[in-house]
C-alpha cells in the first residue's frame, strides 16, 4: 500500500510540472502566432483598420484597384505578398484589360483661350490624354482609400463646379502610372474624409524606386500641397518644392498655362 502511494505521489510530482510546461509552451506559441499574423499576414481593409503603431514607421504592400481622382486611389492590401499566400492561397482582384484603340478621341479639360494662344498647352494635354491605361478599375472591394501626400492635383468637376484645366490629364496620368500595379504605401495620417494620407512608392526595373507624389510634380500634373493643416511630406518637403520649381521654370504640364490657379486657390474661391 505504501509503495502504491509512493508511485502515485511520484507520478503526480512529474505530471503537474509537465502540464505546466506544456501550458506555457502552448500559450507562448499562440501569442507568437497571433503576433506574427497581426504583423505580417493581417489584411487592412480600410484606413481605420491600420494600427496607430504603423503610421510613419512601416510600409504596406498591395495592388492599386482603382483611381478616382488625380491624387487618390484605392489600395488592396496584400501583406507579405506571395509569401503571405497571395495569388495561390488568398485571391487578389483581377482587373479587366482594356485594348488600345487609337481611333478613340479622349476628352481634354482645355479652355478655348488655351487652344487659341498656347500650342504648348495643347501639346501637353494631348500627351497626357494619349497615355494608354491598360486596365479598368474596380470598386466595391475591401480596399484602403489612399490620398497621395504632399501634392494637390487640379480639381475635377464636383457638385456643379467646373473642372480645372489639366484635371482630366492628371487623372489619366495617375491611372496610366499605377492602376493595376503593386505599390508600397507608408501611412502618415488619416484625413477628414477617412482617407489614408500616405507616401507611395512604385518599383521599376528601369527607373528604380519612384515616389508617385514627386513624379507628379516632375510631370507637371500636380502642385505642392498648400494647406498648412494636415500637410504630410515624410521629411521630403524640400524635394517636393525643388521639383515643383523645376517644372514651373520649364513650363511643364499645368505650368504651361498663361493663367494658372492652384487647386488650393480654386477651392477657396469656389
UniProtKB/Swiss-Prot annotation:
Assigned keywords, A-Z: Calcium, Endonuclease, Hydrolase, Membrane, Metal-binding, Mitochondrion, Nuclease, Transmembrane, Transmembrane helix
Molecular-function annotations in GO: endonuclease activity; metal ion binding
Cellular component GO terms held in the UniProt record: membrane; mitochondrion
Domain TNase-like: 58-257
UniProt EC number: 3.1.-.-
Membrane disposition: Single-pass membrane protein
Residues binding Ca(2+), per UniProt: 152
Active-site residues, as the UniProt record annotates them: 147, 155, 195
Protein name: Probable endonuclease LCL3
Organism: Kluyveromyces lactis (strain ATCC 8585 / CBS 2359 / DSM 70799 / NBRC 1267 / NRRL Y-1140 / WM37)
Amino acid at each position: 500500500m505504501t509503495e502504491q502511494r509512493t508511485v502515485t505521489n511520484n507520478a503526480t510530482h512529474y505530471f503537474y510540472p509537465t502540464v505546466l510546461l506544456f501550458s506555457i509552451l502552448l500559450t507562448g506559441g499562440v501569442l507568437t502566432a497571433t503576433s506574427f499574423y497581426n504583423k505580417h499576414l493581417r489584411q487592412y481593409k480600410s484606413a481605420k483598420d491600420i494600427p496607430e503603431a504603423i503610421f510613419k514607421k512601416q510600409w504596406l504592400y498591395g495592388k492599386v484597384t482603382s483611381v478616382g481622382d488625380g491624387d487618390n486611389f484605392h489600395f488592396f492590401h496584400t501583406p507579405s505578398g506571395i509569401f503571405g499566400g497571395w495569388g495561390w492561397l488568398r485571391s487578389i482582384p483581377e482587373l479587366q484589360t482594356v485594348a488600345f484603340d487609337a481611333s478613340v478621341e479622349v476628352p481634354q479639360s482645355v479652355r478655348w483661350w488655351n487652344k487659341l494662344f498656347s500650342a504648348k498647352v495643347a501639346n501637353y494635354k494631348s500627351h497626357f490624354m494619349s497615355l494608354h491605361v491598360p486596365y479598368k478599375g474596380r470598386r466595391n472591394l475591401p480596399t484602403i482609400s489612399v490620398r497621395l501626400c504632399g501634392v494637390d492635383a487640379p480639381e475635377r468637376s464636383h457638385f456643379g463646379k467646373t473642372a480645372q484645366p489639366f484635371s482630366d490629364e492628371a487623372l489619366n496620368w495617375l491611372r496610366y502610372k499605377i492602376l493595376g500595379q503593386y505599390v508600397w504605401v507608408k501611412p502618415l495620417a488619416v484625413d477628414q474624409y477617412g482617407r489614408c494620407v500616405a507616401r507611395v512608392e512604385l518599383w521599376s526595373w528601369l527607373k528604380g524606386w519612384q515616389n508617385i507624389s514627386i513624379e507628379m510634380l516632375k510631370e507637371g500634373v500636380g502642385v505642392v500641397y498648400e494647406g498648412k493643416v494636415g500637410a504630410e511630406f515624410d521629411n521630403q518637403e524640400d524635394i517636393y518644392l525643388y521639383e515643383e520649381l523645376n517644372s514651373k521654370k520649364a513650363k511643364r504640364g499645368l505650368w504651361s498655362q498663361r493663367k494658372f490657379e492652384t487647386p488650393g486657390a480654386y477651392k477657396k474661391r469656389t
